[in-house]
Amino acid sequence: MRPDHHPTPFSADEIRDGFVPGTVVRSRVERAGAEPVVHVRVSIAADPDGGIYEFWTESLDGRRLEEPVQQRSIWRELQAHASMPVDATTIDRVTIDVPMGTFDGLRYTRVEGETVDTFWFATSMPGAPIRMEERVAGELVFSSTAIAEQRP
């Protein structure tokens, strides 16, 4: 998206085409010092420019912890989230094994000072990474791992 950035794993058009209203993705989220939770993302509706998602958080046993919130995102903005600088990022072809399944994918690893952010994108699932980690000074401070996907 920028001349000093790597190509993104998916184009805005691929993200739009991969957005299926009614799809529900659940991800286990862990933050340093907090209990793990499940983040739920539901694809609600789409048009040529963007899509509407609904989000909420659940406990590991499925109890809703907050009211759902809807958000509209523009396809190009979603693509831009994966735009990473060449001088700080490596890209590797990998096999991704998560509770949701095993996928061929791309692993983007961005290093900025003591912070290492790693994003695993399943090439068959245009959109958000199915796994993410953030480490600061070697300590894991955040992770998100897709655990289930339900399509209509």
Question: What kind of region is each of these model predictions?
Answer:
Residues 1-152:
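Acidic, serine/threonine-rich low-complexity disordered tracts
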